[in-house]
Every structure is written in C-alpha cells, then in structure tokens.
C-alpha cells in the first residue's frame, strides 16, 4: 500500500486521489460530496475532483 508523506501533510486533493485509487470512483465522489456538505460550501477543489473523478 501507500506510506503517508513523511515531511509534509497530505493535501485534500491527494487524499481524494488516494481514495480513488484504493476504493474506486464512487467512493471518492461520495467522500468529496461529504466533505463539501460538512463545510457547507462547494469549493473549487470539490468541483474539480467530481469532474475528474467520473
């Protein structure tokens, strides 16, 4: 599997990409939607991920 980055934090986009690789497109899209729902806004990163995901 993947080891976490040692010197730097994982970005949101990296985290979603990792979910996509590990669990598939549907899981990554749901993960992204849940993130946007929790922060009560649709951020640019969420839209990018949803468009690129499926």
From Swiss-Prot:
InterPro entries: CYSTM1_HM_Tolerance, CYSTM_dom. GO terms for cellular component: extracellular region; plant-type cell wall; plasma membrane. One of its GO terms (molecular function) is metal ion sequestering activity. GO terms for biological process: cellular detoxification; detoxification of cadmium ion; detoxification of copper ion; response to cadmium ion. It comes from the Eukaryota. It holds the Pfam family CYSTM. It is found in: Cell membrane; Secreted, Cell wall. Disulfide bonds: none annotated. The keyword Metal-binding applies. The chain crosses the membrane at residues 24-40. Induction: Down-regulated in root tissues but up-regulated in shoot tissues in response to cadmium (CdCl(2)). Keywords: Cell membrane, Cell wall, Membrane, Metal-binding, Secreted, Stress response, Transmembrane, Transmembrane helix. It is a single-pass membrane protein. Expressed in roots and shoots. Confers resistance to heavy metal ions (e.g. cadmium (CdCl(2)) and copper (CuCl(2))) by chelating them at the plasma membrane of root cells, thus stopping their entry and reducing their accumulation. Belongs to the CYSTM1 family. PANTHER family: CADMIUM TOLERANT 3, PROTEIN CYSTEINE-RICH TRANSMEMBRANE MODULE 2. This is Protein CADMIUM TOLERANCE 5. The gene is CDT5.
